[in-house]
Amino acid sequence: MAKSVRSSKKKVKRVVTDAVAHIYSSFNNTIVTITDRQGNALSWATSGGSGFRGSRKSTPFAAQVAAERAADMALEYGVKNVDVLVKGPGSGRDSAVRALNAKNLKVTSITDVTPLPHNGCRPPKKRRV
């Protein structure tokens, strides 16, 4: 008796033209995630995952490289327009937005969504070096 051959369907990449770029920039690292309007992740990259280690992760150049890597993966989905949501106090905020703009992604809006406490938790004590 002949074995039945199962044909697998090839996964079709969906086309997303409008996306949201979430840039989280801390003092130690920068995370860039590009999602569709519903929040489903299309691509992401970090400055640590881009080959930077230690104090070099927190530089603006590392954030630029991470944003370029995330943009390259998002361009495969057909992304053209990007709303940018920036969160955190880090140094890679501006350079990541510029890198997205340089990759032919039209930045339609830039919004700062850094959470600000209405005097909630007590902050950590100040460093004495």
Swiss-Prot record:
Protein name: Small ribosomal subunit protein uS11
Organism expressing this protein natively: Francisella tularensis subsp. tularensis (strain SCHU S4 / Schu 4)
Claim: Ribosomal protein is one of the keywords in the record: yes
Keyword entries, A-Z: Ribonucleoprotein, Ribosomal protein, RNA-binding, rRNA-binding
Top-level taxon: Bacteria
Quaternary structure, from the entry: Part of the 30S ribosomal subunit. Interacts with proteins S7 and S18. Binds to IF-3.
NCBIfam families: PRK05309.1, uS11_bact
GO cellular component, one term: ribonucleoprotein complex
Family designation: Belongs to the universal ribosomal protein uS11 family.
Biological-process GO terms, alphabetical: translation
GO MF term list: rRNA binding; structural constituent of ribosome
Top-level taxonomy: Bacteria, Pseudomonadati, Pseudomonadota, Gammaproteobacteria, Thiotrichales
Disulfide bonds: none
Pfam families hit by this protein: Ribosomal_S11
InterPro entries: Ribosomal_uS11, Ribosomal_uS11_bac-type, Ribosomal_uS11_CS, Ribosomal_uS11_sf
Coiled-coil annotated spans: none
Function: Located on the platform of the 30S subunit, it bridges several disparate RNA helices of the 16S rRNA. Forms part of the Shine-Dalgarno cleft in the 70S ribosome.
